[in-house]
Amino acid sequence: MRSKIWLATAAVVTVAVATSAVAIAADTQVNTYKVEGSIKGGKGATAKAPKPVAVEFNYYVGEKNGLRPSPVTDYSILFGGLKVNTSDFPGCDVDKLTAAGDPSVCPKGSIMGSGRVINEVGQPSNLNDKSLYCYLELTTINSTKKNHFLLFLKGVQSAPDPKKTCVTQVAEPIDAKFVKRNGGTSLDFTVPQNLLHPASLDNAVTNVQSKLKNQSKKSKGKKVSFFESTSCKSTQKISVTFTQESDGSKQTASTPTKCTK
């Protein structure tokens, strides 16, 4: 009899532990990442004879168990084989842009590209909650500060296309920085808390698309471009390192790129 009671108790404990483990797993966000991208131009470029390029890249953020992804606090986007020439182009003052809330205050020639950011938004206490949505227009702008790059985000609560609305109004820049790395240049930035948690919600990026145009001009008697290729190795990549807010973990996803004519 005692043996039967012990076995029954053990079975209940086992089920309880297993159920608890499943619940913990379901409440733990494990982000997944995918990067796509391409370089247009740059074929035959060298460090002594760089060539102008345009850059396109997209990245996707998912969640392993179908939950809302964890917000990502920090990004480091490495462009293999590329350099930037921020000082040769007009720049926009970040304080002036922040106050105006619109890139129209920026000087001609300072806007370097455009894109979009799509987000899933929900209650922090419910990781299954994806009931809210935020579409942000992205405008990339050269800064007045050397090697700084402004990522201006615009979101509206009302628009003719419901897929281009955001749960909150957004009109502000993220001040990113270009950093010279071994084999290329990275664009590094931290997302402000008010964008990670608008109205005390969790805002999780799920897709970013960005196009950085081939912008060139004459400087000191020679033609320079904002983005230039300095090499065309077959091993070059666009890589993105993501820092997940929920546990501070870092993951890197990449895609190979090759120069074109």
Predicted regions and their residues:
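Generic low-polarity alpha-helical segments
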Residues: 1, 18-24
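Bacterial N-terminal signal peptides that target proteins for export
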Residues: 1-10
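Bacterial N-terminal signal peptides
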Residues: 9-18
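Ser/Thr/Pro/Gly-rich, low-complexity intrinsically disordered stalk/linker tracts of secreted
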Residues: 24-261
